[in-house]
A protein has these predicted regions:
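Conserved, structured C-terminal
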Residues: 1-214
Length: 214
């Protein structure tokens, strides 16, 4: 059965090059890459709380998302903040996260991908396993559509852009031009502080029969 646990759980994300060292100082569980590889999940004891740690990131750096009963939110936040001082921990908001994820070309559902975009057009074919053995319920929903697009070619594709002029800003929905002709529009834009210029993601039209690998 399914139930809505939105109001029952809190979440804090610890991300960055020092995230493992910081989190390891709060728990006895081995957080090495060998023990907890990318996309793994485990329960951790942090102080007086048990958290569910997801080894995942949305900023292009090492990171974890910690989920816990909502009543432990303040306790865990204060514990992480006090411990994080020795690791130069800083709080960041969504604009910071957005800048980092666009530099890494991570797609955002609602901007770069929607339920109307094809997984291959979005450059996410690597997460679709067409050679996976079917379960007792058959293949996944959309299997036939993916196979068809794989052979017919992509209609559009996501590309990443970096402006060479550091004084110009990108937001989203700016036209993408080639030789004076509009060939697409940006779906996301921000300033890339690591790259030193505005960065964006956007769809451009594909040539006939162009595949995801072309």
């Amino acid at each position: 059965s399914l139930f809505n646990s939105t109001s029952a759980e809190g979440c804090i994300a610890i991300m960055g090059p020092n995230s493992r060292e910081l989190l390891q100082s709060l728990t006895d569980t081995d957080l090495s890459n060998e023990n907890l590889p990318f996309a793994s999940v485990c329960d951790l004891e942090i102080g007086m709380a048990t958290v569910r740690a997801h080894r995942i990131t949305y900023v292009g750096e090492l990171g974890w998302e910690l989920y816990f009963p909502i009543e432990f939110s303040n306790y865990i936040a204060e514990l992480i903040e006090s411990t994080g001082k020795q690791f130069s921990l800083k709080l960041c908001g969504m604009h910071s996260v957005d800048s980092c994820r666009i530099e890494k070309a991570y797609r955002h559902f609602g901007h770069d991908i929607t339920d109307e975009d094809h997984v291959l057009d979005a450059g996410l074919g690597f997460v679709v396993k067409l050679d996976k053995n079917p379960s007792k319920y058959g293949t996944f929903i959309g299997y036939d559509a993916v196979k068809k697009r794989q052979f017919s070619g992509c209609k559009k594709r996501v590309m990443q852009f970096l402006l060479t002029n550091p004084d110009v800003m990108l937001y989203h929905n700016e036209p993408i031009l080639k030789n004076g002709e509009i060939i697409g529009y940006l779906s996301s834009g921000a300033y890339g502080h690591t790259l030193g210029g505005a960065v964006g993601l956007g769809y451009i039209d594909c040539l006939s029969n162009e595949t995801e690998e072309d």
